[in-house]
A protein has these predicted regions:
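The start of beta-strands in P-loop NTPase/AAA+ ATPase cores
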Residues: 2-4, 59, 206
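Phosphate- and divalent-cation-binding pockets in alpha/beta enzyme and binding domains
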Residues: 46-49, 156, 190, 217-218, ...
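Asp-based phosphoryl-transfer active-site loop
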Residues: 2-16, 219
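Residue-level signal for inorganic ion chemistry
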Residues: 29, 65, 144, 219, ...
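Hydrophobic/aromatic beta-strand patches that form the interior of the parallel beta-sheet core
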Residues: 37, 62, 207-209, 225, ...
Length: 253
């Protein structure tokens, strides 16, 4: 059996859609006895919204940059909680004040910062709100996500958070967003946890593919791939570049 995992936004989900060719390739891959899943910075519920819309079949979901793992029924089987001391530092950081949006992911729930927008990225999905004090003690909080006006701003704040948090947290940068998790959380670590949980350590091959900076750890760890529209650093780190997820599955199946 082979295992394939792809990033979602910019990799499988491009230009607001998932292509029919990619969906067919995923179906053929799974009919051949292989496993397929998604590894994303999104939370479970925001991911499922589009997974269900496009009827994407899957055997696992790795969400929030590896902080949460879900099975084939979208039930969570692993979660790395963000320590309260780290949360406090993030709440007081200038990068928090500079962000235009903020979301708190806890278990399978998502909340927004009471002092910012009442949505996360998608304006027509209104979410419940929390004050920073409530988020500080929220059970199961495993990711704080911040959004900025443009990628250059988020890149600069990502460096500031990385310097400020040191080894106490994981800082993941992708486009206009920064996601902050417990230390040692990454898409690579999430994949390793998955392989252990599902007892897939003897899999014939593990294929991963992505497009942005938060995909680099898993691409480097698994000698993985990039899609053609990936960031230059991601393409440079990959062992091959494919035009789509489906093409990777067809060629490596």
């Amino acid at each position: 059996m082979k295992i394939a995992a792809c990033d979602f936004d910019g990799t499988l989900f491009r230009d607001g859609a998932v292509s029919g060719a990619d969906l067919e390739a995923i179906a053929v891959w799974r009919r051949s006895g292989n496993a397929f899943g998604i590894v994303t910075g999104r939370g479970r519920n925001t991911l499922l919204r589009d997974v269900e819309r496009f009827n994407i079949p899957y055997d696992f979901l790795i969400c929030n940059n590896g902080a949460m793992i879900c099975d084939e029924q979208a039930q969570d089987v692993y979660c790395a909680v963000l320590p309260e001391a780290v949360r406090a530092g993030i709440m007081d950081h200038p990068g928090m004040r500079a962000s235009s949006q903020c979301a708190f992911f806890a278990g399978t729930s998502i909340f927004t910062h009471a002092g910012k927008t009442d949505y996360w990225i998608v304006k027509d999905h209104i979410l419940p709100r929390l004050s920073p004090a409530e988020a500080l003690h929220l059970p199961g909080l495993h990711q704080i996500s911040l959004a900025y006006a443009e990628p250059g701003e988020s890149a600069a704040w990502s460096e500031a958070f990385t310097e400020g948090c040191g080894e106490s947290a994981g800082v993941h940068f992708s486009n206009i967003c920064i996601d902050i998790t417990a230390p040692d959380v990454s898409k690579a670590a999430g994949m390793e946890h998955l392989l252990h949980l599902r007892r897939w350590g003897e899999a014939e091959d593990v294929l991963v593919i992505g497009d942005d900076m938060n995909d680099l750890p898993m691409i480097r760890h698994f000698n993985g791939y990039a899609v053609a529209n990936a960031a230059p650093d991601v393409r440079a780190a990959s062992s091959a570049v494919f035009p789509s997820v489906g093409q990777m599955l067809r060629e490596r199946g």
